[in-house]
């Protein structure tokens, strides 16, 4: 089968195979795969991973084959794939916090062969390929009427951005919000805040060309971080600061801005992923004196089998934008073009069609 392998360089290859599913696994024919900044982070070393590696982690497709113990999905089902390979049995899973499941972090598997040798899976999904094999818990069945190119974005960009707003920050009606970085993750944070009833949503980005799209997704204001001091600009709009800020860039300087713009009792949610050894600094008094807080957000604190259906329902009601996130689709051969377009800010999301 065809797929994209990282082995010190990008290789769009036909010399790739995915094994049959195990007892609690499903084999999926990938119909569409979103390209996320985390995919770039594998290449530049921000996210260290063993190689050879079958790339991609944001996808949707059709179930082809299921293992003997699988009961929740069947061949022919349209599914969104999620990166959480949670066990479903530990205290975290049973308490409704699958992102806290220890089985979901730091483990590697090799369900592929590349040129006859074992190849690693990325983020438990590896969707830059014609087929993949995942746990049953990672395949969330959706309405087949939903376009799979749009649905493919739910498994990472949507759950991570919207989940941080709904599940971690718990933005409510009348709240004020600032979103730093309005790429694929940030746009979903913006529209989730709008859906939650935020009265003022300030989008901040160094690319002024993103203003129109940010406003389309619900931003009430836009700050060009390259042209002005973002903190000062936001305080002109909201002198008392914001209730919630979301750092979607993964840069210590931006994190400091996201903290400094908080109002009394405000919380900053960190979504962006910097290199593992990155450290950040802030004034302790800036938190303790006015009851501010900092929250990490892993995968939007998502409960995939709850949150994916919610997103699909909102999409079908015309309240959640998915189609508008897909700027362009690309064949696998153009994977490097997608990366280039993303780096230049030309796409909200590029989607590969294996």
Task: Locate predicted features.
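C-terminal hydrophobic helical "lid"/dimerization subdomain
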Residues: 1, 240, 256-260, 305-354
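Cysteine-cluster motifs in flexible loop/terminal segments that predominantly coordinate metals
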Residues: 82-137
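Glycine-rich phosphate-binding loop and adjacent beta-alpha segment
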Residues: 251-319, 354
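Conserved beta-strand positions in the Rossmann-like core of class I SAM-dependent methyltransferases
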Residues: 64, 201-202, 269
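Mid-domain Rossmann-like dinucleotide-binding core that forms the NAD(H)/NADP(H) cofactor-binding site
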Residues: 130, 137-138, 143-228, 232
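A short acidic, Gly/Pro-enriched loop at the edge of an enzyme's catalytic core
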Residues: 233-243
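Glycine-rich beta-strand-centered segment in the early N-terminal region that forms part
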Residues: 19-33, 43-94, 99, 138-146
């Amino acid at each position: 089968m065809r797929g994209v392998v990282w082995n010190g360089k990008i290789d769009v290859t036909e010399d790739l195979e995915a094994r049959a599913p195990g007892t609690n696994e499903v084999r999926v024919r990938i119909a569409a795969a979103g390209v996320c900044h985390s995919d770039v982070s594998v290449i530049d070393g921000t996210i260290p991973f063993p190689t050879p590696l079958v790339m991609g982690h944001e996808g949707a497709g059709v179930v082809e084959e299921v293992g003997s113990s699988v009961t929740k999905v069947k061949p022919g089902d349209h599914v969104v794939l999620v990166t959480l390979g949670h066990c479903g049995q530990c205290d975290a899973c049973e308490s409704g916090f699958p992102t806290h499941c220890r089985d979901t972090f730091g483990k590697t598997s090799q369900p592929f062969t590349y040129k006859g040798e074992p190849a690693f899976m990325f983020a438990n999904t590896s969707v830059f390929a014609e087929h993949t094999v995942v746990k049953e818990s990672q395949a969330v069945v959706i309405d087949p009427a939903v376009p799979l190119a749009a649905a493919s974005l739910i498994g990472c960009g949507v759950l991570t951005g919207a989940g941080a707003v709904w599940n971690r920050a718990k933005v409510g009606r009348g709240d004020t919000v600032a979103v730093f970085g309005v790429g694929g993750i940030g746009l979903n944070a913006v529209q989730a805040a709008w859906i939650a009833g935020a009265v003022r949503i300030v989008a901040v980005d160094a690319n002024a060309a993103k203003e129109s799209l940010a406003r389309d997704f619900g931003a009430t204001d836009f700050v060009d971080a390259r042209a002005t001091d973002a903190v000062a600009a936001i305080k002109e709009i909201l002198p008392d600061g914001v209730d919630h800020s979301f750092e979607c860039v993964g840069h210590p300087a931006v994190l400091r801005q996201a903290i400094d713009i908080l109002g009394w009792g405000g919380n900053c949610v960190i979504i962006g992923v910097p290199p593992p050894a990155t450290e950040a600094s802030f004034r302790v008094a800036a938190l303790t004196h006015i009851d501010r807080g900092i929250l990490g957000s892993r995968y939007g604190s998502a409960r995939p089998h709850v949150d994916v259906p919610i997103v699909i329902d909102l999409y079908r009601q015309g309240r959640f934008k998915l189609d508008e996130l897909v700027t362009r689709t690309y064949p696998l051969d153009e994977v490097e073009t997608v990366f280039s377009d993303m780096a230049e800010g030309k796409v909200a999301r590029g989607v590969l069609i294996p």
